Amino acid sequence: MVICVLATVSYETGALTIYKQFLKALEHFGGEHEWHVFIAEGMPNPTINNVKYHVCHTKGIDRMKFDFVGFKRIIKEFGIKPDVVFSLQNTGVRCKASRYVIYFHQALAITKYTINLRSKFAKTYLFYHYFYPLYIRLLINKKTFIAVQTNQIKNGLSKRLGFPKDRIGVYFPETEKIDVSELESYEYETETYNFIYPATPFEFKEHITLAYAVNEAYKQNPELAKKIRVNLTLSLGELPDMDNYIKQNGLENNFVYHGRIPHQQLLSMVKSSDGLLFPSVIETLGLPLLEAASLGTPVIANDLEYVHEVLNGYDGVKYVKVHDYEEWGRKILTCCSQKHYAPYSLPEDNSWERLMKLITEGIIQNK
C-alpha cells in the first residue's frame, strides 16, 4: 500500500510535536507499506525503512495552491499513486485515493468567542472560526476519516461541519512523562503565595480574568491578597488592557512578568507553586493542566468541557464558572492554604497504534 503523509506546515510548536510523535509511530507500526512524507525544509527526516521524504514549500498562498492543485501535480511528477493520504495539517487535499485521514487539532475553528475587533488577535480568530471550516469542507468527502485528540473536539467538529461522528476517532496525544527527580526547587519571593499561568498573549487565554480575580480577592481578604503573586509567561506590554487595569487598581505587586521560560524551568515553577491558574476558554488539549496534575499541583480552571475531560480523575482541580471573578478570587484565596495532591497519571493509551490502524486499515478502534 502506498501512503502519502502531509506535514508541510508542521514545523513549529504543537504541530511539530505531533509530527515527531508520528515519526516514532511510523518506525514501530509502519509495516511494509510504502510511505511518502511531505515536509518543509529543515524538518526532522530520520531514516526509517520504506519511508521517503519530499520537501515542499507551502507557506502563505502556496498552501492553498498545494491543497487544491499542487500536491496532485507533485505526485504525478514523482509517479506516486497513493492508496491513502494522511494529513497532519487539519485539512485534506485534492487527489485520487481510496482513503483520506485528517489529523485535526485547531480548536479556534469550532469554538465561539466574543472577540474585540480592535485586538491583534481578531483577524486570526475570524479567519479560523469563519473561513477555515468552509475551507475544510471543500477538502473532505465520503472517503474521509478525521482523527482528533479529545471528545470535545470530536463533538464540536461534527456539529460545525455536519460530519458523521462514526468517521471521527479520538486519539489522546502522548504526553511526556516528567521525571520529578530532575526538577529543581524554584525559589519564589519569601512569605508570598505563588500561582502560575503559562500561556501565550492571545485574547481567548483570558489573562485579564486573573487581574479581576485578584482585585476581588482584596475585597474578601486584603491581608492575604497582598501576599498573592501571579506569575505569567508574558512580557510587560503584551496585553496593554490588562496592564492598564493592573496599574489602575494598584495590583502591580501581585503580578510577575517572566517572559518566555524554558520548559524545564517552567515545570520547576509549577511544581514549587501554590497552584496553576488556567482561565483559558479555547483549548485543543491544555497541556499545562496535565503537567500540573502529574506534579500534584493544585489547579483552578474554568468549568469547561475540555478541562473536565483532560483532568478526569484528578482530585486537585477546582472549577469556576467562566467570568465569575468573585469566585475566582475566592478559590485563589482558598488555594493559599492548600497542600499538593497525589500526582495524577494518565491511563495507558495506545493512541498512535490505534491511529496507525485507521491509516492503514480504515478501522476506528476505541481504546
Summary of predicted features, one role per range:
Residues 141-181:
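Donor nucleotide-sugar binding/catalytic pocket of nucleotide-sugar-dependent glycosyltransferases
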Residues 281:
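Aromatic "clamp/platform" in nucleotide-sugar-dependent glycosyltransferases that forms part
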Residues 292, 298-301:
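Short hydrophobic beta-strand element within catalytic cores of glycosyltransferases
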Residues 317-326, 334-337:
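Conserved acidic donor-binding segment of nucleotide-sugar-dependent glycosyltransferases
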